[in-house]
From Swiss-Prot:
Composition bias, Polar residues: 288-303
GO-annotated molecular function: membrane curvature sensor activity; protein domain specific binding
CDD domains: BAR_ICA69
Name of the protein: Islet cell autoantigen 1
Source organism of the structure: Homo sapiens
Family matches, as PROSITE patterns: AH
Disordered: annotated span: 281-321
Domain AH: 51-254
Tissue localization of expression: Expressed abundantly in pancreas, heart and brain with low levels of expression in lung, kidney, liver and thyroid.
Any single GO CC term annotated in Swiss-Prot or TrEMBL for this entry: cytosol
Primary localization: cytoplasm
Alphabetized UniProt keyword annotations: Cytoplasm, Cytoplasmic vesicle, Golgi apparatus, Membrane, Neurotransmitter transport, Synapse, Transport
Source organism phylogeny: Eukaryota, Metazoa, Chordata, Craniata, Vertebrata
SMART domains: Arfaptin (SM01015), ICA69 (SM01237)
Length: 483
């Protein structure tokens, strides 16, 4: 009996454990979903159940910290490599610049710049040696993330699933226990079935819980080992770099020790640098102006003398201008008294004499002037030669291209427009009148002389043997003149 009683629960447990009906699965999934919903919404769970998993929660926090810090470390290593390359490039450029400037400067300062530039170029090359341990460090961190952390993460996910099943089975057992009545054996089979599910879920959960705790501990230890090994390599390389750089810089400092190219002065008051620049520019302008004034002083004196002479001449011209114009008007009035041949020869217009005579109010010629005018009038009016054979020969040789233009005649009652300006002409008005007449004479075609004897009478002095009076005469008239 005892053996039979002892063997009964195990047989019953095996029977309930093998119960995989659809109803049992649906009930199990229902309580698992309810537990997941409680966890997602953050509702308060049973404090005793939560306290039993305190050590597991601590390990999970450590795992999430390792996962997060490894990701940040990988990003920091990549950024650090970029910054080292950028710093080495800038340091190399600075070294090249100092060397180029040092070659141009032949003083000791140029030698200092050359030595410093070489040291900077050497330092930039040695700094790039840090990339080798950093690249190795980055590879190790990435391997650690993709292998160790990923494997632990899968184990944690399986553990969380089993914990949800276990806590769901506890909720299911709690609900069934409320309807249980041990005295009447009511709901006993149902309670035993749920109790069997709780035991199986706890067994799986405890196994995965142990795996997670062990893997998290191993993960933390492996990370410490990785960091200590890789950081030791990086630290050694960094120390070698600073040692070489410090020796190079110290050697440059010792070689140029005692060289002091600067002279220091103490300022009593601060001044604006812009004000100093403005004062320097003003001084330069003043000095340039003084030098230019001294250089231009002698030529300016000569120019001033010439200007004074021109002013004197212009003043004398202004004072004598009126007198010269009046004398010209006097001569014009005397010419109007001459006979027709003179007017034809000189192309003088009767209107000019009419306008110049009354305006100028010239007196009659005196003494020798009267005798000269009378002599000229007698010479030109001595004989009136007609156009004869000479005029035909002249036309045959030179052509009859001279066209006579009719002189515009004015009515007797119309006054002369040139004489309407008034009796008192100013010198400027007389000059303008002469210029207008001159332009009109240039624009008009030259008039043909009606009588060619006037020309021969003027040029008779050139050939005294020829007789100008015989031009255009017949043979009988020649004989009479010769007699």
């Amino acid at each position: 009996m005892s053996g039979h009683k002892c063997s009964y629960p195990w047989d019953l447990q095996d029977r309930y454990a093998q119960d995989k009906s659809v109803v049992n699965k649906m009930q199990q999934k229902y309580w698992e979903t309810k537990q997941a919903f409680i966890k997602a919404t953050g509702k308060k769970e049973d404090e005793h159940v939560v306290a039993s998993d305190a050590d597991l929660d601590a390990k999970l926090e450590l795992f999430h910290s390792i996962q997060r810090t490894c990701l940040d470390l990988s990003k920091a290593i990549v950024l650090y490599q970029k910054r080292i390359c950028f710093l080495s490039q800038e340091e190399n450029e600075l070294g090249k610049f100092l060397r180029s400037q040092g070659f141009q400067d032949k003083t000791r300062a140029g030698k200092m710049m050359q030595a410093t530039g070489k040291a900077l170029c050497f330092s930039s090359q040695q700094r790039l040696a840090l990339r080798n341990p950093l690249c190795r460090f980055h590879q190790e961190v990435e391997t650690f993330r993709h292998r160790a952390i990923s494997d632990t993460w899968l184990t944690v996910n399986r553990m969380e699933q089993c914990r949800t099943e276990y806590r769901g089975a506890l909720l299911w057992m709690k609900d069934v226990s409320q309807e249980l009545d041990p005295d009447l054996y009511k709901q006993m089979e149902k309670f035993r079935k749920v109790q069997t599910q709780v035991r199986l879920a706890k067994k799986n959960f405890d196994k995965l819980k142990m795996d997670v705790c062990q893997k998290v501990d191993l993960l933390g230890a492996s990370r410490c080992n990785l960091l200590s090994h890789m950081l030791a390599t990086y630290q050694t390389t960094l120390l070698h770099f600073w040692e070489k750089t410090s020796h190079t810089m110290a050697a440059i400092h010792e070689s140029f020790k005692g060289y002091q190219p600067y002279e220091f002065t103490t300022l009593k008051s601060l001044q604006d640098p812009m004000k100093k620049l403005v004062e320097k520019e003003e001084k330069k302008k003043i000095n340039q102006q003084e030098s230019t004034d001294a250089a231009v002083q002698e030529p300016s004196q000569l120019i001033s003398l010439e200007e004074e002479n021109q002013r004197k001449e212009s003043s004398s011209f202004k004072t004598e201008d009126g007198k010269s114009i009046l004398s010209a008007l006097d001569k014009g009035s005397t010419h109007t008294a001459c006979s027709g041949p003179i007017d034809e020869l000189l192309d003088m217009k009767s209107e000019e004499g009419a306008c110049l005579g009354p305006v100028a109010g010239t007196p009659e010629p005196e003494g020798a002037d009267k005798d000269d005018l009378l002599l000229l009038s007698e010479i030109f009016n001595a004989s009136s030669l007609e156009e004869g054979e000479f005029s035909k020969e002249w036309a045959a040789v030179f052509g009859d291209g001279q066209v006579k233009e009719p002189v515009p005649t004015m009515a007797l009652g119309e006054p002369d427009p040139k004489a309407q300006t008034g009796s008192g002409f100013l010198p400027s008005q007389l000059l303008d009148q002469n210029m207008k007449d001159l332009q009109a004479s240039l624009q008009e075609p030259a008039k043909a002389a009606s009588d060619l004897t006037a020309w021969f009478s003027l040029f008779a002095d050139l050939d005294p043997l020829s007789n100008p009076d015989a031009v255009g005469k017949t043979d009988k008239e020649h004989e009479l003149l010769n007699a």
